[in-house]
């Protein structure tokens, strides 16, 4: 039998958060490989053992904090000390459950995933308390992440990241750019660093569906839109092209599906104007199955990278769903981003609009993109070898077994 695993994942399916998907894939395919996997996740209320191998304890979510001491403490920590995360109270409740689990035999290898940070808090505590084998998985950068830019958290983040790298047996990055950043920052721990990209589950059966009959084409974005991930360049270009008569608003609809933080957007006036004209359609957040149907029935797909003043180190998780549909993808990103490199490996037609493109260059690219045929393309075999769930689970399984072999629990 393969080594047992305790997967500490604050977010876990069926939670409707993109951060839950990677943990769900890991658990599913590690079990296929013979690992007994127990998941420790959060819930809005204490749910206990919701499945034979999934245990949920009450967590804190920004949209529904309790009006009790734990809720007020959560708000205070979030506001004054660590504004980039939630779930601080969950960490202690989760640790109490994990302590009981660690007394079982054989003891598991702990795999924790971030964000939010509290997953690694639990992993670090289990390492310190029980000498557990520990693999720390990062779905985003941590210290130095341009998005985690709160001044009051900078010193804590740096110290916490060093503690993770010092104590974890393995650390896993989800992009090669992040892995290289780590190697420069912590050369003394290079041998701990591994790369497992985000990916996709072929068994979900996501693929193109027939396009419904309609008098217009649809370019769809599915996911959250906020200050650092927004469609301003595309909207501005669509406005200019419409004014010049090069784009017929009756023949195109830009469909934005998901949460939209209008107050944070630099393009909110333009968004309101194009929505009023009918060129833009805003659809509230949908369940995952419904959002995938939107992807599968769209002529084109819009992928928004993190648009920052520095080169992107991110790859939006949606890219792995989009490429399974196979229809053309317009990527708004920075130059030389890992998102562009992932798309280049897929075999799916795409075009990139870069943050430093001129208005004229952006307009040229948008028109060129909209001239692409919407026939779906098949994924390249080499793409699946890197990004499909089973090859990634095999890689993680190897790390788990290596960690188990080097772990010596105290008697």
Put a short name on every predicted segment.
Residues 39-102:
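A conserved catalytic-core segment of Leloir-type glycosyltransferases
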Residues 43, 177, 196-199:
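Carbohydrate-associated surface elements
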């Amino acid at each position: 039998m393969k080594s047992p695993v305790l997967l500490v994942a604050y977010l876990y399916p069926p939670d409707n958060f993109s951060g839950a998907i990677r943990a769900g894939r890991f658990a599913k395919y590690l079990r296929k490989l013979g690992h007994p996997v127990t998941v420790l996740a959060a819930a809005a209320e204490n749910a206990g053992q919701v499945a034979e191998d999934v245990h949920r304890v009450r967590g804190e979510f920004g949209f529904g904090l309790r009006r009790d001491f734990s809720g007020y403490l959560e708000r205070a920590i979030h506001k004054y000390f660590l504004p980039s995360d939630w779930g601080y109270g969950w960490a202690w409740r989760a640790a109490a459950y994990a302590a009981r689990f660690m007394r079982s035999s054989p003891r598991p290898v702990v795999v924790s995933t971030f964000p939010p940070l509290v997953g690694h808090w639990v992993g670090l505590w289990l390492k310190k308390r029980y000498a557990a084998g520990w693999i720390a998985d990062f779905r985003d950068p941590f210290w130095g992440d341009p998005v985690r830019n709160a001044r009051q958290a900078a010193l804590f983040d740096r110290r916490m990241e060093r503690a993770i790298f010092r104590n974890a047996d393995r650390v896993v990055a989800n992009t090669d750019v992040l892995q290289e950043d780590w190697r420069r920052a912590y050369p003394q721990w290079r041998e701990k660093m591994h790369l497992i990209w985000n990916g996709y589950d072929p068994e979900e059966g996501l693929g193109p569906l027939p396009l419904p009959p309609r008098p217009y084409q649809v370019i769809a974005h599915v996911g959250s839109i906020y200050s650092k991930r927004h469609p301003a360049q595309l909207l501005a270009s669509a406005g200019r092209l419409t004014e010049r008569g090069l784009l017929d608003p009756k023949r195109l609809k830009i469909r934005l599906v998901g949460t939209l933080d209008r107050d944070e957007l630099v393009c909110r006036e333009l968004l309101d104007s194009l929505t009023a004209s009918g060129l833009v359609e805003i659809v509230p957040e949908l369940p995952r199955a419904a959002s995938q149907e939107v992807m599968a029935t769209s002529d084109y797909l819009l992928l928004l990278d993190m648009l920052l003043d520095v080169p992107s180190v991110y790859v939006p998780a949606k890219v792995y769903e989009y490429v399974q549909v196979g229809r053309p993808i317009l990527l708004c990103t920075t130059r030389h981003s890992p998102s562009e490199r992932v798309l280049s490996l897929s075999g799916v037609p795409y075009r990139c609009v870069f943050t430093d493109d001129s208005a004229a260059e952006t307009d040229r690219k948008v028109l060129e993109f909209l001239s692409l045929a919407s026939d779906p393309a098949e994924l390249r075999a080499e793409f699946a070898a890197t990004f499909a769930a089973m090859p990634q689970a095999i890689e993680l399984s190897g790390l788990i077994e290596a960690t188990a072999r080097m772990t010596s629990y105290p008697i």
